From Swiss-Prot:
Summary of subunit composition and partner proteins: Monomer.
Molecular function terms from GO: 2-methylisocitrate dehydratase activity; 4 iron, 4 sulfur cluster binding; aconitate hydratase activity; metal ion binding; mRNA 3'-UTR binding; mRNA binding
Function: Involved in the catabolism of short chain fatty acids (SCFA) via the tricarboxylic acid (TCA)(acetyl degradation route) and probably via the 2-methylcitrate cycle I (propionate degradation route). Catalyzes the reversible isomerization of citrate to isocitrate via cis-aconitate. Could catalyze the hydration of 2-methyl-cis-aconitate to yield (2R,3S)-2-methylisocitrate. The apo form of AcnA functions as a RNA-binding regulatory protein.
Residues bound to [4Fe-4S] cluster: 472, 538, 541
Keywords of this entry: Iron, Iron-sulfur, Lyase, Metal-binding, RNA-binding, Tricarboxylic acid cycle
Matching SUPFAM superfamilies: Aconitase iron-sulfur domain (SSF53732), LeuD/IlvD-like (SSF52016)
Keyword RNA-binding: yes
Originating species: Corynebacterium jeikeium (strain K411)
CDD domains, A to Z: AcnA_IRP (cd01586), AcnA_IRP_Swivel (cd01580)
Disordered: annotated span: 401-449
Name of this chain's protein: Aconitate hydratase A
Family designation: Belongs to the aconitase/IPM isomerase family.
Native organism taxonomy: Bacteria, Bacillati, Actinomycetota, Actinomycetes, Mycobacteriales
Enzyme Commission numbers on file: 4.2.1.3, 4.2.1.99
Reaction(s) this enzyme catalyzes, per UniProt: citrate = D-threo-isocitrate; (2S,3R)-3-hydroxybutane-1,2,3-tricarboxylate = 2-methyl-cis-aconitate + H2O
Amino acid sequence: MAESINSFDSKSTLQVGEKSYDYFALDAVPGMEKLPYSLKVLGENLLRNEDGKNITREHIEAIANWDPSAEPNFEIQFTPARVIMQDFTGVACIVDLATIRDAVVALGGDADDVNPLNPAEMVIDHSVIIEAFGDSDALEKNVEIEYQRNDERYKFLRWGTGAFENFRVVPPGTGIVHQVNIEYLARSVFDNNGLAYPDTCVGTDSHTTMENGLGILGWGVGGIEAEAAMLGQPISMLIPRVVGFKLTGEIPTGVTATDVVLTITDMLRQHGVVGKFVEFYGKGVGELPLANRATIGNMSPEFGSTAAMFPIDEETVKYLELTGRDQETLERVEAYAKAQGMWLDPEKEVEYSEYLELDLSTVVPSIAGPKRPQDRIELNDSKAQFRKDLHNYVEADASAVTPDFDAEGPATENTSAQTAGTPASAADAKGNIPSAAAGAEGRPSNPVTVNYNGEDIELDHGMVAIASITSCTNTSNPSVMVGAGLLARNAAAKGLKSAPWVKTSMAPGSQVVNGYYEKAGLWKDLEAMGFYLVGYGCTTCIGNSGPLPEEISAGINEGDLAATAVLSGNRNFEGRINPDVKMNYLASPILVIAYAIAGTMDFDFETQPLGQDQDGNDVFLKDIWPSTEDIEEVIASSITKDLYAEDYANVFEGDERWRSLDVPSGKTFDWDPKSTYIRKAPYFDGMSKEPEAVNDVKGARVLALLGDSVTTDHISPASTIKPGTPAAQYLDANGVERKDYNSLGARRGNHEVMVRGTFANIRLQNQLLDGVSGGYTRDFTQEGGPQSFIYDAAMNYQKENTPLVVLGGKEYGTGSSRDWAAKGTLLLGVKAVIAESFERIHRSNLIGMGVVPLQFPEGESWKSLGIEGTETFDIEGIEELNNGSTPKTVKVTATKENGEKIEFDAVTRIDTPGEADYYRNGGILQFVLRNMMSGK
């Protein structure tokens, strides 16, 4: 760490017990004391890294004099203390760093000059896929398959730990990066050779914001931005607006942390917080356990905010103590936070840019779906809302709507509590077989009978095909995890079980969960419901749900059924969870089990029983719902500091499989030209020491014409590779058998696979084509512009030197911090993306890869302008960047085949001078490499 020039003379000494620390005192700068917590962290960051060049006295004064009402317009340079990665994005990062070493050597430099300057830590959590489930061997089977599939990748990462300084890897089978981060990796307040400063951390996963619950400022960035941060490049940003979110009251009985976070997500999405910090304050904050704060922080990308901060307080220190941090750390965190005015004072209200308020006592049980996290549904309305939404997923003539009718004849023994004509449960027998079509009156229904596990069962629209307790969002939270275990216990005691067509799974975010489940004796109850341990990793939440049983999959496809998934995750975008599933719902772990028992989303927990007990009595959800007292009692008796200490004692060592990997050595990597997993990246091929001039775009064609809320999943899916697609064709040509395709996410170290998988999501709707889903476009290099794979068309355009553009709607690039969504866009030959609005990370990633993001004029869209996608595009004004200034707008001309022109001024979304530098250099990594070679 370079020495600060300390122009405010702010360096001071903090005495904590017998130990003293240097620190940069905020009170040396007038105005810092009145700032929100998150801006105080930024202020300290600038004080400590002031170098008189990138960070000057003017930058520090700009933070201190922050105007809450102003729109962001002042650029600062944020220097994170560390970087975390997951393996899907992380492998690509290490491939890029290894490639940069090669480029440095080729330009006459030393490979040793390329190293992370601050801690860079990776947790391998994205590679485990749920192949096996429903039995006690599932974990071992899935781990074994994971190692077989990922041998090359894991050897490469082991090489990286030996080749690079400051780089460590948490091996597979340990947990999920964000949960491991808050439970172990997070420092809260650093002690760097006697210098104390706040832990700040960016990560190559958008849910890095989980650490915000611990008072750590950070957020998800693209892999390319993370690589630059590792190499010492500060992150360019505008001083943001800060939304104050006041919490009052207490969470009522029967309401979970998941319900709270879905409510907050709904509120903040409606309010609009893209590009802003959200900061929680008020007396209600003190009532929230740290795990609940982490759950809320985790969902920041779903709100759209950059960060969702909770200041440090007693609850923070209690959590650090529970998770095994030493006494010196606890004392340092508390003393530092109090000395810097960063300790939460519930009575004090600072000035924010905007305000929202939630009385926690008003929160009700909720789920979200069927395709966005912000689509919150109150549980009482879930059946009615499902029936409304179902019509969007079922062809009008593909399924008959079963008419409503009153049952005739006398009531049978177990129908007393039911609506007339409605079975006790969707999993009840219909025609003496378990049926997901039970109670289908009034909605589309298309029953399909299959034989599974020796039993005839009936599938239908709304069937819960997947019920998965997954994701760090919820598995880090003991209240909902213990609650799920107790609900399973109560259900088992009543003789209930999951519907036979449901693929059930339990994938905790750390081994600590296994520890307290064992201690509380809850595993046998969870397993009775089918929820066996399948792995420690992201699994279903990122689309690694694994295949459905063949019979179930065949039945769903035969009937073109709108099957559903219920998961305790953070994202439910279309096409993300499983290719056989059309509708995805987020729910608490407790409700995941409840829906597994119900077997269908077409279910009203208030009026419909889940089944009958041994005496034939109806059992409703309320009858098995665990009490708050029971949950707290299990937590108090089962979760101890020793559990965390034991599970994290040897966190970097791994199992015998990891330790026995045959690891290559050397400062530079010996690339295998036959590898289909790890290939040298092409971004520096032919790169000169000086950047070339940027050019206007002339004669471009539209590669994709897209609507609103196109996610980075749509652009660069992480899902399994579909046979027959360009990515599969490449693997076939390289001798890879279909069973070994693995997922696109697992192959992010190979650009040849990834460029072929760009815009290849099976749910992508390219509106250049009518009624076609998937990675297709029209290829205007051929007569009549026939339908073609997007990759094939892009390669034809490249042969003719025709540049490409992509047109989008609102919230383009929402979702994961997936740098391959930008890398793949570049490698396809796209020069510009024009959309109505961009999500923060993807906009930044596009610039970081040398693709210009442009925005339609306010209130306009490609549709309103009359653009059809068959036009050729010219973009004038980009060349102004060569003169050192960024044009506010550029002129776009779309010329139709008949010569008619559509002209408009698009807003240039290169928002800071730093981003302009990246774009002029062809990308952020080229900028960093050129600076490295010139000694800057």
